[in-house]
Amino acid sequence: MAELATIARPYAEALFGVAEAGDIAAWSTLVQELAQVARLPEVLSIASSPKVSRAQVSELLLTAVKSPLKDNAQAKNLVQMLVDNHRLPLLPEIAVQFEELKNAREGAADVLIVSAFPLEGAQLNDLVASLERKFKRKLKPTVEVDSSLIGGVRVTVGDEVLDTSVRARLASMQTALTA
């Protein structure tokens, strides 16, 4: 995975440079859509088939996305370059890195909140506001439910993890008691 990240980084940075001159949100949407299409095993199979030309693969990818930028010359060049260099499997990683660059520019970060129970509107808003004060940046939450936590939440922002779950506390007590 680290290798994919290393190979994808220059593509993401170059694409972000192009996006900065225009509409970053629109480019973000395009990259996310392309990544979603590139994840499909059928698309990867077609892309690797010797019976299908590279131009046809590029056209297939661009036809599959809804973004108005799909007709942009730079977007077409990106897709053609990835197809020509057999780099379609990189698109999901390029999308991840593009989002990281976008978030860094906005002073924001993605946060994964794993809770033992579903979080409702006001409860989620309060938690996110509290986390934004702690991490000193705007957070874009994604919420998952994992009943094995028993109670509490586990929050992941980048490479930082804040685990206040009952399961983590029990594990900590077990370690303390057996030491």
From Swiss-Prot:
Q: Which gene encodes it?
A: atpH
Q: Which UniProt keywords apply?
A: ATP synthesis, Cell inner membrane, Cell membrane, CF(1), Hydrogen ion transport, Ion transport, Membrane, Transport
- Family assignment? Belongs to the ATPase delta chain family.
Q: Which Gene3D superfamilies match?
A: N-terminal domain of the delta subunit of the F1F0-ATP synthase (1.10.520.20)
Q: Which GO terms describe its molecular function?
A: proton-transporting ATP synthase activity, rotational mechanism
Self-association or partners: how does it assemble? F-type ATPases have 2 components, F(1) - the catalytic core - and F(0) - the membrane proton channel. F(1) has five subunits: alpha(3), beta(3), gamma(1), delta(1), epsilon(1). F(0) has three main subunits: a(1), b(2) and c(10-14). The alpha and beta chains form an alternating ring which encloses part of the gamma chain. F(1) is attached to F(0) by a central stalk formed by the gamma and epsilon chains, while a peripheral stalk is formed by the delta and b chains.
As for what it does, the entry says: F(1)F(0) ATP synthase produces ATP from ADP in the presence of a proton or sodium gradient. F-type ATPases consist of two structural domains, F(1) containing the extramembraneous catalytic core and F(0) containing the membrane proton channel, linked together by a central stalk and a peripheral stalk. During catalysis, ATP synthesis in the catalytic domain of F(1) is coupled via a rotary mechanism of the central stalk subunits to proton translocation. This protein is part of the stalk that links CF(0) to CF(1). It either transmits conformational changes from CF(0) to CF(1) or is implicated in proton conduction.
- Origin superkingdom: Bacteria
Q: Name one Pfam family in it.
A: OSCP
Its localization reads: Cell inner membrane
Which named protein is this? ATP synthase subunit delta
